[in-house]
Curated annotation (Swiss-Prot):
Gene label: IL2
SMART domains according to UniProt: IL2
GO BP term, example: positive regulation of B cell proliferation
Protein name per the record: Interleukin-2
Disulfide bridges in this chain: C79-C127
Taxonomic lineage of the native organism: Eukaryota, Metazoa, Chordata, Craniata, Vertebrata
Protein's organism: Ailuropoda melanoleuca (Giant panda)
């Protein structure tokens, strides 16, 4: 009699676990959505920087950023993550009508979260940077292009 109750309890537990488990989405689809979000956030930053009314653009262009030698895989997003602090500091120079401090903080937070999801939490990848530096607009454009190329390989 107890065996039957035990089997019933186990079966009920399995049903509950199976029904409450999240349905797995396609890793490729999830990666595509995260890349789209990253591209959107980078474009918003780029639009704020490139705003023709931005009086501090010439000053912002004096700051130099490093790009990886060959960025071809998601693991190369570690290189973007390493440059984010400098990017954020430079963006704080430009608190214009189109790019407020709260917007910068929110976008940078979104980018950090998305990068963590895309590259994972392991920071074992060591970036190899180009010797030449780029401006803030080139930096953002190149990372947007990188995301587009990775996205196209996933479709």
């Amino acid at each position: 009699m107890y065996k039957m109750q035990l089997l019933y309890c186990i079966a009920l537990t399995l049903v509950l676990v199976a029904n409450s488990a999240p349905t797995p989405s396609s890793p490729t689809k999830e990666t595509q959505q995260q890349l789209e979000q990253l591209m959107l956030d980078l474009r918003l930053l780029l639009n704020g920087v490139n705003n023709y009314e931005n009086p501090k653009l010439s000053r912002m262009l004096t700051f130099k950023f490093y790009m990886p030698k060959k960025a071809t895989e998601l693991k190369h997003l570690q290189c973007l993550a390493e440059e984010l602090k400098l990017l954020e500091e430079v963006l704080y120079l430009d608190q214009s009508k189109n790019l407020h401090l709260t917007d910068i903080k929110e976008l940078m937070s979104n980018i950090n979260v998305t990068l963590l999801k895309l590259k994972g939490s392991e920071a074992s990848f060591k970036c190899e940077y180009d010797d030449e530096t780029v401006t803030i607009t080139e930096f953002l454009n190149k990372w947007i292009t990188f995301c587009q190329s990775i996205f196209s390989t996933l479709t």
